[in-house]
């Protein structure tokens, strides 16, 4: 319910600041969750939003709540962990006489704090990259996957991290990952991880090697 209000705040602020001059932009991350969610669903939504607040590329953040959602702003703040109060603000719309005016004012305060931030060189060893399956097509095994494989080799060789998920899609091509393990302990962990997933499939009477298509198996086998 608060998405429309947040969009009004964003639009007005951008108009008043010449599109937030001197920054990479002001982005609105709206979503349809927060109300009527319980248990793990609620925790997952809150955790995802909190991770976005703490993201190192976020110069400043305004967290907006309507006031009646399950994902209460006070609980969100209390479970957020450490944060810079000059760069992370919170607003409950039902506590404001004019929520748009109050939100725009908060954005101006945040803007003054972060508008002069400058990029500085960093170390590759400080970065973590998540690899996402973009869907299989005719070029996956020719360009995309080999490129990500070489990219991962380069990042890891320089102390960085890449994260590869979707273990069942490794079936039939797991030996490629195993050949990249840095030591016997890592190799054994990889074997255990893959075999545990295979046993899970078997326990539920599911075929193991039919998960990746022939095309995907070929694509995986040609990647690094």
Report residues per predicted region.
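Metallocofactor- and cofactor-centric catalytic cores in central/energy metabolism, strongly enriched
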Residues: 1-222
């Amino acid at each position: 319910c608060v998405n429309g209000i947040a969009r009004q705040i964003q639009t007005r602020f951008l108009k008043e600041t010449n599109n937030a001059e001197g920054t990479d932009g002001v982005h609105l991350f709206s979503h349809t969750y927060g109300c009527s969610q319980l248990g793990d669903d609620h925790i997952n939504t809150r955790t995802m939003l909190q991770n976005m607040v703490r993201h190192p590329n976020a110069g400043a953040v305004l967290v907006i709540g309507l006031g009646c959602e399950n994902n209460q702003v006070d609980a969100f703040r209390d479970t957020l962990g450490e944060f810079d109060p000059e760069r992370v603000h919170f607003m409950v719309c039902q506590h404001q006489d004019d929520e748009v005016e109050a939100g725009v004012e908060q954005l101006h305060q945040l803007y003054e704090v972060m508008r002069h931030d400058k990029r500085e060189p960093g170390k590759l060893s400080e970065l973590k990259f998540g690899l996402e399956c973009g869907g299989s097509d005719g070029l996956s095994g020719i360009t995309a996957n080999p490129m990500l494989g070489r990219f991962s080799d380069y990042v890891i060789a320089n102390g960085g991290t890449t994260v590869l998920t979707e273990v069942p899609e490794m079936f039939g091509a797991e030996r490629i990952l195993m050949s990249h393990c840095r030591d016997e302990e890592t190799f054994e962990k990889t074997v255990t991880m893959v075999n545990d997933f295979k046993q899970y499939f078997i326990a539920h009477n599911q075929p193991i090697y039919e998960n990746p298509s022939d095309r995907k198996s070929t694509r995986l086998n040609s990647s690094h």
